[in-house]
Regions:
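Rossmann-like flavin
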Residues: 134, 138-229
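Helical element adjacent to the flavin cofactor pocket in flavoenzyme catalytic cores
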Residues: 231-296
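General small-molecule cofactor/ligand-binding pocket signal
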Residues: 125-127, 267-269, 439-441, 472
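N-terminal glycine-rich phosphate/pyrophosphate-binding loop and immediately adjacent elements
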Residues: 3-161
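Mid-domain catalytic core of redox enzymes
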Residues: 272-394, 514
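Conserved flavin/dinucleotide-binding core of flavoenzymes
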Residues: 374-516
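Hydrophobic anchor at the start of a short beta-strand
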Residues: 7, 28-31, 303, 341, ...
Length: 516
């Protein structure tokens, strides 16, 4: 490792590796990525089951090591059956691939992830769903959503109004949708409908994309842009618009990005915490790292920070930022939490239902907000091994749950257990042999599973710091004009960062107009 670089990037997640790979490959810059953990990937942590537990990036993990990897991405196990020691000892995870929290890429092989990987010559197949179904909790009926068909779980009036509003969303341009960036989707809904059925269904639909249960906390522009670009991309939830990854899981995205980065001369330091960004005369000029031999300074012309906003003040002293910005980050920004369930099954139970086995399944309002939750609790669930058979061993199947709660709710054990219990009861009502078909279950929570979000009315911190020269940000929580969420948002943020840091218009170079 040298003493000076063109660019130092803090964090080896998807955003940091994207910025590094493209600066190295296209701009021939000397770039160093520094990662405090012992592995690349950030929140893309993925596991492949073996005869004695799981492996992560080829390394077999003990239970404490598995829990440490989870902890590195703010995730922890809340329920396992049988318990983790028995799961490990019996080799129940052998042949399964899963993540530290449910992952999917929006638009699959046409998404931003695919665009960047293809740009770098590192294509990855991301097969996705084929179909979308809604399950009515009042009578447990399953409804395959058909293009142009009536929404039979809604009243005739609500179905008609819902379709009218969906047409309005999908006919917007990105510029028109951007007018709603600073209001909540709850406000947008209240301004467009007085029908509670319509409100609840569209709120649940939005939760698929935004992983937020309360529309009043959801930026309207982010969701409306998802809807606005569907026709240009030629994909939607009905035809298939989400991608999954086979072994070794979504961490393979990071592996491919890191490969492109290293092939272009980039360097990665693992297991090395950055303790401070060096700032002189309000200019970032390098970083201080902690090595086994003590602190060390590394100079850089530019610094890119991918640490989430709520953690930056550990390496960027507050004194360099306006007090309002510091207060907002500390007190008003919040974490979109994710409760994830992974279930190993003996048979393909979804074939019992009259829906496409590769459908995304939406269960709206399983628990009402009036029962003590910040928003209605909706369930997104699917058989991921039907999307990609390699996610489960031959003859077995992997069922996944994604449930949105806030960061504070994730730390309320009573609420988390209530949601898991209700989800389990729902499955038993719909599949009487649910327990007999199940070989194992694993539930995890993360209080930052879908990133850090600003309060309604505020934009995310932009990719170029306005107060410290030569300091840039990237990651799913950055970019005043990036939109979307999760991995695709991290990639968008990275491309926007490259627009400011590099010498080219990378947004136009890499992304189709509908992704900008």
């Amino acid at each position: 490792v040298a003493e000076k670089y063109d660019v130092v990037i803090i964090g080896a997640g998807a955003a940091g590796l994207t910025v590094g790979a493209i600066l190295s490959a296209r701009e021939q810059k000397k770039v160093l990525v520094i990662e405090k953990e012992e592995a690349i990937g950030g929140r893309l942590a993925s596991f492949v089951g073996g005869k004695k537990g799981v492996s992560f990036l080829g390394k077999e993990l003990t239970i404490p090591e598995y829990e440490k990897v989870l902890g590195s991405v703010n995730t922890w196990v809340v329920r396992a059956s049988p318990d983790l020691p028995a799961i490990w000892e019996q080799g129940l995870l052998d042949g399964y691939t899963f993540e530290a929290g449910v992952h999917a890429t929006f638009w699959g092989d046409k998404g931003r992830v695919a665009c960047v990987l293809d740009y770098l010559g590192k294509h990855s197949d991301l097969p996705g769903n084929e179909g979308f179904a809604v399950i009515d909790t009042r009578d447990n009926k399953w409804y395959q959503v058909q293009r142009g068909g009536k929404y039979d779980w809604l009243s005739d009036e609500a179905s008609l109004e819902t379709k009218t509003l969906l047409r309005e969303m999908t006919s917007m341009s990105l510029e028109e949708a951007a007018r709603y960036d600073l209001i909540s989707f709850g406000q947008w809904l209240n301004e467009h409908t007085k029908n509670r059925e319509v409100y609840e269904y569209l709120a649940a639909l939005a939760s698929i994309h935004m992983v937020m249960g309360e529309p009043d906390m959801m930026p309207a522009g982010d969701f409306l842009k998802f809807m606005a670009v569907a026709s240009d991309i030629g994909m939607n939830l009905i035809t298939g618009s989400t991608g999954t990854a086979g072994p070794p899981g979504f961490v393979d995205v990071a592996v491919k990005l890191a490969g492109a980065f290293r092939e272009s001369g980039g360097e990665i330091m693992l297991g090395t915490p950055v303790t401070e960004v060096m700032i002189a005369d309000q200019k970032a000029c390098g970083v201080i790292i902690q090595t086994k031999d003590g602190p060390r300074q590394i100079e850089a012309r530019d610094v890119v920070c991918t640490v989430p906003p709520n953690h930056i003040f550990g390496i960027l002293p507050e004194k360099h930022f306006p007090s309002e910005f510091v207060t907002d980050i500390k007190e008003r920004f919040w974490g979109a939490g994710m409760l994830s369930g992974y279930i190993g099954l003996k048979r393909n139970i979804i074939e019992d239902k009259a829906v496409n086995p590769r459908s995304w399944l939406l269960v709206p309002s399983l628990i009402k907000a009036s029962e003590g939750f910040i928003g209605d609790v909706d369930i997104i669930t699917f058989m991921s091994s039907n999307f990609n058979p390699l996610r489960a061993p031959e003859g077995k199947h992997l069922w996944e749950f994604s449930i949105a709660l806030t960061d504070k709710e994730m730390h309320d054990t009573g609420k988390v257990n209530r949601v898991v219990d209700e989800a389990t009861a729902f499955m038993q009502r719909n599949f009487p042999a649910w327990r007999d078909d199940m070989e194992w279950e694993l539930w995890t929570t993360s209080d930052e599973g879908y990133g850090i979000w600003p309060p309604i009315g505020k934009r995310r911190p932009d990719v170029k710091c306005p107060w410290i020269e030569d300091l840039y940000f990237a990651g799913d929580s950055y970019g005043a004009h990036r939109w979307g969420g999760g991995l695709d948002a991290a990639i968008h943020s990275a491309v926007l960062c490259l627009d400011r840091l590099g010498s080219m218009d990378y947004s136009t170079e890499i992304l189709p107009a509908y992704h900008r």
